[in-house]
Amino acid sequence: MKLTCMMIVAVLFLTAWTFVTADSRNGLEYLFPKAHYEMNPEASKLNKKRDCVAGGHFCGFPKIGGPCCSGWCFFVCA
């Protein structure tokens, strides 16, 4: 019985939350104020590869993206 009441309250809360957040047409405009092309790519930390490992050096377990400058690691950076 308690679980049923909790589920009903949760569904009502989520339904109300959906209606409250969907109320504004410009909600996404304020959430994402600038388009991707308007952003400064130089300010992004994701684009900087200062601390990466050069090709031919040990990088660890095979993975994509890891510490290598190229982004490819198969025990040795590509």
Swiss-Prot record:
InterPro entries xref list: Conotoxin, Conotoxin_omega-typ_CS
SS bonds (residue pairs): C52-C69, C59-C73, C68-C77
Subcellular location: Secreted
Source superkingdom: Eukaryota
Record's keyword terms, sorted: Calcium channel impairing toxin, Cleavage on pair of basic residues, Disulfide bond, Ion channel impairing toxin, Knottin, Neurotoxin, Presynaptic neurotoxin, Secreted, Signal, Toxin, Voltage-gated calcium channel impairing toxin
Functional summary from the UniProt entry: Omega-conotoxins act at presynaptic membranes, they bind and block voltage-gated calcium channels (Cav).
The protein's name: Omega-conotoxin-like VnMKLT1-0111
Natural source organism: Conus ventricosus
